[in-house]
Curated annotation (Swiss-Prot):
One annotated GO biological process: flagellated sperm motility
Protein name: Cilia- and flagella-associated protein 251
Listed Polar residues bias regions: 118-128, 172-182
Organism of origin: Pongo abelii
Composition bias type Low complexity, residue spans: 99-111
């Protein structure tokens, strides 16, 4: 069954029209068998024998079973009689011409039939990554037959009335998007109380063959009853309570979202349901959150790869629509009862701009979207039909401004209104004409001779002939809708609107305009909420709540309870003074606070207050389940992340934005760095100042804070490339923090600031790493007031820049620093000598690693099995240690599409936390290491995972060439012209390695070659004390894959070099003059001698044979004989250099950094 609401069974007639029939009660003879294994037997005889045994058992059951059978027979007769009566009634209605029918276009039927007949689905296909679908084939029949004639007849009769099991073919689109909702394409009624779940699945049944084989019906029904399979989908059979039931299934991902702190206060929050549980809907980054306030549970609607830009809900709160902005943008419709995505629109914006505004009709049949492109498009979607194209589309002129709000007429789903800040547009949809007409009168100050103000929101007036548009000047523009009289024979034109009057409601700007029951409701920038009747007369208001600017108002779908003697509804402000009876509602404010107002007694409850600005700083307590979250708005909040309980917070004075947070190793202190350079040391349990005054030794944002292992030192780094150190001293018998010294030690931004311990003592050591490729050690013992001593400086990279640094866990006898760089590499440096001991391919998920931490061990048994948690630009991931380049040892998931600002790991290693920066959220991820280990096991052993990194794999052309070059290097090292017996071995000398590397397309620099030599030579030195001077083919393959650029030679890297070295020529391209090009080769970087340069050009221009330099028998052209002025053009561009001079085949992958 598809995961959607089931519609009542339809009787299909020859003319292609359908009549809706009421859903029948299930027959009591449908009951589950006690031995479900019988359904899996394919042997017909064995199946029949089991049926005989069950029948004999049933005869011995007693009088109760006999009575049930008699009742079943009676129900069967009643069902048959009802069917006959309804068939007669339908014929009478059809004859009298009073039957309301929905027409299916012949072309649509034909196309759908062809699709159903030709497409075959795979039995293992998965829908939406959640529920597997069984194999469906309309021509395949099950061989199981019934022997009991009475049961056979009963099932045959029921199969014509009950909803049939969806075992027919479905299109791949239905599989992929799990969209079981169907409607005929004919015009639907404008006013209807029937919800879409009464129509879902209708189109597929309309397109079914009239006469399905009775044998298949019997077989389907029988298998369904025997196996206990529900005849209803999960979406149609669920209740509201199922969403928050605990999922006991085993996790299937290494990282699973368990909680999201914060919310996107620029989007609305909706009141989903209230009866037994208070449930809200809001957005965090790219995830929609369904939050149960009473249970303190969250359910996450995950499916978007970009930040969600808008969302809406149906009037009954059953259906949720979300949309995003960015590449491959999606529109997803969800079932709020189950959390299942019932339909996905993949190509809503082919240009990739995303959706700016969205609305759903009150009956939830149609969805309207407005794109966020420069030329906006208004589209109306019949989403219940699971179509991939809109029913109609309208492009808006750019002079209308950016339309950022849209809503349907609640009583006519063919009318809409939208507005930008300066223009309101009325739409009328003519479905039969495939036309979306619009009217957008120009409104200026001269229209009413008064200042109108900028529009905020618009709604349809309760009197059905007017539209209201609210402005930021506290006014309402009233528009009259002029509809031409309806005529069956002639078309009298499209409707249009005209500005009628300007009503000055209040002084405060109106930010929210909506309707509920018989009231028009406004919310303003001062936090006031006011209610007006249809004449725009004030009825009541809430002005004493002391709220921020109103961002959203969402009223409960449950009507207000009638007043009783115990009720405490306030009186309205009319002369009669009637009780102001109103639904409860949710209030969302621009300062990221959400409130619930119980109108009976006017009880305001604060549900949560979250940071209203970017969240860049998070830190986990070292031995308690606490997380501190800091925001640019100056708020620090501390949560217990085990029970999801907010504990305490502190809001600093205006202008102090929290940029960095770190607990000290004892967990007693919390260091906080601020955007304007201030450093606070706070008590971790109260957030009160530990020092009398904060430290102010920087003028720029403090980006890093770190404590030494004994909490005697604290170091900070800021955006002016400066490292500052603070020290704990004893003054007058009290321990106080004092400033020690600071030093601008880097030329570019500091990426890591790390304390460690010296191997020969327990003294702390301090290291800093910058994008200037410098690793700097500081001498804390020799430092004194205002003088921070530098111990040593080392270069970490040549072309790429380092991104982060962490102490490598003690998995080996050697102590390492693990440094990640912008070239997707992970490097291990000896902690003492700073020699690069190993270079490895790190996780490559679209951007380099930006931060990483070693996952704390959970037990002593796990000391030899360690893991890294890392973040890159938009993802969080896990990496199994030791890193060896195996791509199956890592996994990542999108956590914040617009960028990750920070990361933290719980003290027990169970959770990772990511801060989303400007998306104002922090996500908690549960770590399941067993899933990642399973992926490694499935990826293969030894070299199997590495073969997948080669073009063509183990049997491909590239690997064959690599083998040829490897063994050819043995011949060359022994001499090409030697007459002695060849000694073929499994190894080559290290001196041959650079030549083989270059022969297969990897051109390492001299520094990289030295790193490769050191890596191989000292690979076993610590364990054996011996140096290695040769390498075999498997080890060579690993070295090659770990050292080469992960995406090959890219034009982006060459273009970046020309951006730095070149000038802009007459064609607008970066170029280098020939003289400058030759001068750079012999003077900059790993410069050549002039002879080496000329020899290289001779080889590149084909003047020297291959292998000339190492094969004495070959003759070569002397470099002095080459005339470079003739061979090289006057100016050299990146394309000329790559293709004409070097002769490279360049990859089009140009989005990687550091290549």
């Amino acid at each position: 069954m598809s995961d959607a609401e089931e519609a009542p069974r339809e009787a299909t007639r020859e003319n292609g029209e359908t009549e809706m029939k009421e859903e029948e009660e299930p027959n009591p003879n449908y009951k589950e068998v006690e031995d479900p294994q019988q359904e899996s037997k394919d042997d017909t005889l064995a199946w029949r024998e089991s049926q005989e045994e069950e029948r004999k058992t049933g005869e011995e059951e007693g009088e109760e079973e006999e009575e049930k059978e008699e009742e079943g027979k009676k129900d069967k007769k009643i069902v048959m009689e009802e069917t006959e009566e309804k068939a007669g009634e339908s014929q009478e209605k059809e004859a009298s011409g009073i039957q309301e029918e929905t027409t299916v276009e012949p072309q649509e039927v034909t196309e759908s039939m062809i699709r159903l007949e030709t497409q075959i689905t795979d039995s293992q296909s998965v829908t939406s990554g959640i529920f597997p679908k069984t194999q469906r084939g309309s021509k395949s029949k099950l061989s199981l037959q019934l022997e009991d004639a009475e049961t056979d007849e009963l099932l045959r009769d029921l199969s014509t009335q009950l909803e049939f099991l969806d075992l027919d073919q479905i299109s791949p689109e239905e599989q992929q998007i799990s969209s079981p909702e169907r409607q005929p394409s004919g015009e639907l009624e404008e006013k209807t109380d029937q919800m879409p779940q009464d129509e879902l699945g209708q189109e597929r049944r309309d397109l079914e063959p009239e006469n399905r084989e009775e044998g298949q019906e019997r077989t389907v029904s029988d298998i369904q009853s025997k196996a206990g399979i529900s005849r209803e989908s999960l979406v149609s059979s669920t209740t509201e309570d199922i969403l928050f039931q605990k999922d006991k299934s085993a996790p299937v991902y290494p990282l699973t979202m368990t909680w999201s702190f914060g919310w996107n206060s620029s989007l609305p929050v909706y009141y989903i349901r209230e009866e037994k549980q208070r449930v809200l809907l809001y957005v965090c980054a790219h995830t929609a959150i369904i939050y149960n306030v009473f249970r303190n549970n969250q359910y996450h609607l995950q499916g978007h790869a970009n930040i969600i830009s808008c969302l809406c809900v149906s009037e009954d709160r059953r259906w949720i629509a979300t949309a995003d902005k960015g590449p491959d943008c999606l529109v997803i419709i969800w079932d709020s009862f189950t959390g299942i995505p019932v339909h996905t629109i993949f190509d809503s914006c082919p240009e990739g701009s995303g959706i700016r505004a969205m609305a759903m009709t009150h009956d939830a049949k149609y969805l309207a979207t407005i794109s966020d492109a420069e030329v906006q498009k208004v589209c109306i979607w019949k989403w219940t039909l699971a179509v991939e194209t809109p029913a109609c589309t309208l492009e808006l002129p750019t002079e209308y401004g950016v339309q950022n709000y849209v809503t349907f007429n609640p009583t006519n789903n063919k009318e809409l209104v939208s507005n930008s800040k300066t223009w309101a547009i009325y739409y009328a949809w003519y479905e039969e004409r495939d036309t979306l007409a619009h009217s957008a009168p120009l409104l200026t100050e001269k229209t009413f001779n008064k200042l109108v103000g900028k529009f905020s929101q618009s709604v349809f007036h309760l009197n059905l002939t007017q539209i209201l548009s609210a402005t930021m000047e506290g006014k309402l523009v009233v528009w009259d809708i002029h509809r031409p009289p309806s005529s069956a024979s002639t078309f009298l034109g499209f409707p249009y609107i005209k500005p009628c009057k300007l009503v000055h409601l209040q002084k405060e700007g109106i930010t929210v305009l909506t309707t509920t029951d018989s009231y028009i409701v406004t919310g303003d920038i001062k936090g006031n909420i006011k209610f007006y009747d249809h004449t725009l007369s004030i009825v009541n208001w809430y002005s004493h709540l002391k709220l921020g600017a109103i961002r959203t108002l969402s009223f409960s779908k449950t009507p207000a309870t009638p007043p009783t003697e115990k009720s405490n509804y306030p009186p309205d402000c009319t002369l009669k003074g009637d009780l102001f009876v109103l639904r409860n509602f949710i209030i969302g404010t621009s300062d990221a606070a959400v409130y619930h107002l119980t109108t009976d007694g006017t009880k305001l409850e604060k549900l949560f207050v979250e940071p209203k600005d970017a969240i860049c700083a998070i830190s986990c307590h070292p031995y308690q389940p606490l997380i501190a979250i800091g925001s640019i708005c100056g708020m620090i909040k501390v949560w217990n992340y085990e029970n999801k309980q907010y504990l305490f917070s502190r809001v600093f004075e205006k202008g102090l934005g929290v940029q960095s947070l770190t607990y000290n190793p004892e967990g007693a202190l919390l260091g906080a760095g601020f955007t304007e350079g201030t450093v606070y040391i706070l008590d971790a349990m109260s957030l009160e100042n530990e020092s009398p005054e904060p430290f102010k030794y920087s003028r720029t944002s403090v980006t890093h804070i770190s404590f030494s292992h004994d909490s005697q030192y604290m170091a900070t780094a800021d955006r002016s490339f400066t490292v500052a150190v603070y020290m704990l001293v004893v003054r007058n018998g009290q321990r106080v923090w004092e400033y020690l010294a600071r030093l601008r030690s880097h030329r570019k931004s500091i990426r890591s600031l790390l304390f460690g311990v010296y191997l020969d003592s327990n003294e702390p050591r301090l290291l800093s790493l910058g994008t200037d490729r410098l690793l700097i050690g500081y001498d804390l013992l020799r430092s004194y007031k205002d003088c921070l001593e530098v111990l040593d400086i080392h270069h970490t990279d040549q072309g790429c820049y380092p991104t982060c640094m962490v102490w490598y866990p003690p998995l080996t006898r050697e102590l390492f620093l693990l440094i990640c760089n912008s070239g997707y590499k992970v490097k291990l440096f000896n902690a003492t000598t700073k020699m690069c001991r190993k270079t490895l391919l790190g996780p490559a998920y679209g951007s380099p690693i930006e931060q990483t931490q070693v996952l704390p061990v959970r037990s002593m048994a796990e000391l030899q099995k360690r893991y890294l948690v890392f973040i890159n630009r938009d993802k969080v991931g896990l990496q199994i240690l030791p890193v060896d380049g195996n791509p199956h040892k890592t996994s990542a998931i999108v956590c914040h599409p617009n960028g990750v600002a920070g990361m933290a790991v719980s003290y027990d290693g169970h959770y990772a936390f990511t801060a989303g920066g400007h998306d104002r959220s922090v996500v908690q991820w549960k770590i399941t290491l067993s899933v990642l280990e399973a992926a490694v096991s499935l990826g293969g052993e030894d070299l199997t995972p590495f073969y997948g990194l080669l073009s063509g794999g183990r049997e491909g052309k590239f690997y064959r060439e690599l083998e040829d070059y490897f063994y050819y290097s043995q011949l060359r090292s022994q001499g090409i012209d030697t007459m002695e017996t060849r000694k073929v071995s499994e190894h080559i000398c290290l001196s041959e390695l650079p030549f083989v590397m270059r022969a297969i397309g990897f051109y390492p620099s001299e520094e990289k070659i030295d790193d490769i030599f050191n890596e191989i030579k000292f690979g076993e030195y610590v364990d054996t004390g011996k140096l290695i001077d040769k390498i075999n083919l498997p080890d060579f393959l690993k070295v090659y894959l770990n050292h080469k650029p992960p995406f090959g030679n890219t034009m982006s890297g060459i273009h970046k070099s020309f951006e730095v070295l070149g000038y802009t020529n007459s064609k607008g391209k970066k170029a280098i003059r020939r003289e400058d090009f030759l001068r750079l080769l012999v003077t900059k970087g790993e410069h050549m001698t002039e002879e080496e340069m000329l020899d290289c050009f001779a080889s590149l221009f084909g003047l020297n044979p291959e292998g000339w330099k190492s094969e004495p028998a070959t003759s070569s052209v002397k470099g002095s004989e080459i005339c470079l002025e003739e061979e090289l053009p006057d100016e050299i561009t990146a394309e000329i250099f790559a293709t004409e001079i070097l002769g490279l085949t360049i990859s089009e992958y140009s989005s990687q950094d550091g290549q």
